Design a protein with these regions (language model features):
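Structural motif in protein kinase domains
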Residues: 1-13, 149
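Activation segment of protein kinase catalytic domains, centered on the conserved DFG
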Residues: 13-28, 161
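Protein kinase catalytic-loop region centered on the HRD/HxD motif
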Residues: 32-45
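Activation segment
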Residues: 100-105
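Conserved catalytic-loop aspartate of Hanks-type protein kinases
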Residues: 108
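Intrinsically disordered, low-complexity cytosolic regulatory tails
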Residues: 164-169, 173, 180-240
């Protein structure tokens, strides 16, 4: 692909920084791709190795899923899962799959949630070059999910050029994908609907950076209360 993979552009060595609008579009394209694999055909395909290096960008910066080497057909009618040897990439694999080898489409949903935090933070899911307490992305972001601290996890390479509300809402979607119980995770078609709403709201909103969280002069009390409730409802779904 002309513009390589998402992983390439999230790397600190990359000369190109993906804008926030581009990251939202990538999240949307990737969700659409997974939803099609899971629900758009007469048979189901489980990607099984969904990660940023397998999401390629074409000349128009549209995201395309690639490398289906580990993909498997979903369970036959009447079955809930497939039992397989555990394969995939550390940092993206769902905990129940690692523990049992039981394969369902919900492992892709988990991996997608990890990927959303990768887009938000610009960090790899597992990076042993960082300090010990920052090596695992999901563990590192946990203390910052509250309203006041959220900005601290946003990719510094964005240099403040992002829409804070859309980033917070994307994190809520990620949290719903990262529910410990796979049956409680949404289907990818439902995830796509959530991401579509975020993209639509972002397109209608301002392109400039939003004010700090402690500056409430530009939002009503009702809007602020709704935003806090949205974040807290998302935190209930966190993977702990």
């Amino acid at each position: 692909m002309p513009n390589r993979s998402v992983e390439n552009h999230l790397s600190v060595r990359s000369e190109t920084t993906l804008s926030w609008a581009m990251r939202l579009k990538i999240a949307q394209d990737a969700a659409r791709g997974l939803a099609y694999l899971h629900e758009g055909m007469d048979f189901q395909i489980i990607f099984r190795d969904f990660k940023s290096s397998n999401i390629l960008l074409d000349e128009q910066w549209n995201a395309k899923l690639s490398d289906f080497g580990l993909a498997r057909l979903g369970p036959s009618e009447g079955l809930t899962h497939i039992s397989t040897a555990v394969v995939g990439t550390m940092g993206y694999a769902a905990p129940e799959y690692i523990q049992t080898g039981r394969l369902t489409s919900k492992i892709d949903v988990w991996s997608y949630g990890v990927f959303l935090y990768e887009l938000i933070t610009g960090r790899r899911p597992l990076d042993k070059n960082r300090p010990r307490n920052e090596q695992r992305l999901l563990e590192w972001v946990k203390p910052y999910l509250s309203d006041r601290k959220f900005q601290l996890i946003l990719d510094p390479r964005l240099k403040g050029k992002y829409q804070l509300k859309s980033a917070q809402r994307l994190a809520v979607v990620a949290n719903r994908c990262l529910v410990r119980n796979p049956k409680s995770r949404p289907k990818m078609s439902e995830v796509l609907e959530m991401v579509n709403r975020i993209v639509e709201a972002s397109s209608a909103g301002p392109r400039t950076p939003e004010p700090p969280l402690n500056d409430v002069s530009l939002e009503t009390a009702r809007e602020r209360k709704r935003r806090i409730i949205d974040l807290r409802s998302g935190e209930k779904f966190v993977w702990s």
